[in-house]
A protein has these predicted regions:
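Alpha-helical/coil-rich non-catalytic "connector" segments in signaling and regulatory proteins
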Residues: 1, 146-147, 198
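Signal-transmission coiled-coils
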Residues: 1-97
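Flexible, glycine-/charge-rich segments associated with ATP-binding catalytic modules
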Residues: 4-8, 12-13, 17, 50, ...
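Conserved ATP-binding N-box helix of the HATPase_c
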Residues: 41, 45, 116-147
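Helix-loop-beta hinge of the Bergerat
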Residues: 85-119
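Short, non-transmembrane amphipathic alpha-helical segments
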Residues: 126-132, 164-175
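Short beta-strand/loop element within the Bergerat-fold HATPase_c
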Residues: 142-158
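Glycine-rich acidic phosphate-binding loop
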Residues: 156-164, 188-190
Length: 198
């Protein structure tokens, strides 16, 4: 009986470790592009470089995303739904670092609801993709988030066009996430260029 008890205990511990490793691998895959960017920045600069300050601020911007995206993934792992406030906190912190980087930023949000966890992650990834794709050209960024039961709208308003943005952005993921929530993601790009997925 003692041996069986020890064996069962070891199996339980192994299952916990396996689950933790699975989660870490999942998060690793989610944030790998940003981690690679940070590693690249840190390898390529030294304190004597004239762009050292700017590059370190850029690294901080990526690190803020890594922190918040990882946090969202951890919360989502344990819950089918998350509070839209988690998304608000994530975008707020990221925009603080965008301002620190030198781009004027503003964030307005309205309402509070429960989000299907896939929708929450998708919206934050979309926001991040907009910022990263436009980082070299924009001077200001306004993000508006509207949360209502069964509807979440994010608008990213930039002062320059994004060089390239797929109009079918993560269409498959958006369709798969639409079981519980209806989401509409929009980007307004002057002059009146619009990306809209409903």
């Amino acid at each position: 009986n003692y041996l069986i008890s020890v064996e069962n205990e070891l199996k339980e511990k192994k299952a916990i470790v396996d689950e933790q490793n699975r989660l870490y691998d999942k998060i690793d895959n989610l944030i790998k592009p940003e981690m690679d960017k940070v590693k690249g920045i840190l390898k390529s600069i030294s304190p004597e470089d004239k762009d050292f300050d700017k590059e370190m601020r850029l690294a901080c911007l990526y690190i803020a995303y890594i922190k918040r995206r990882s946090n969202l993934a951890m919360i989502m792992e344990n819950k089918l739904d998350i509070s839209s406030n988690e998304l608000v906190y994530a975008i707020k912190e990221s925009l603080d670092y965008l301002s620190f980087y030198g781009i004027r930023s503003s964030f307005t949000y309205e309402g509070e609801t429960s989000l299907d966890n896939k929708v929450g992650g998708l919206i934050f990834e979309f926001y991040q993709d907009c910022i990263i794709r436009s980082l070299s050209s924009i001077h200001s960024c306004l993000v508006k988030l509207e949360c209502k039961p069964n509807k979440v709208v994010i608008k990213v308003i930039l002062d320059e066009k994004i060089t390239y943005f797929d109009l079918n952005y993560k269409k498959k993921e958006i369709e798969e996430s639409n079981g519980i929530m209806k989401i509409s993601i929009k980007v307004f790009l002057p002059p009146q260029v619009q990306f809209n997925t409903s």
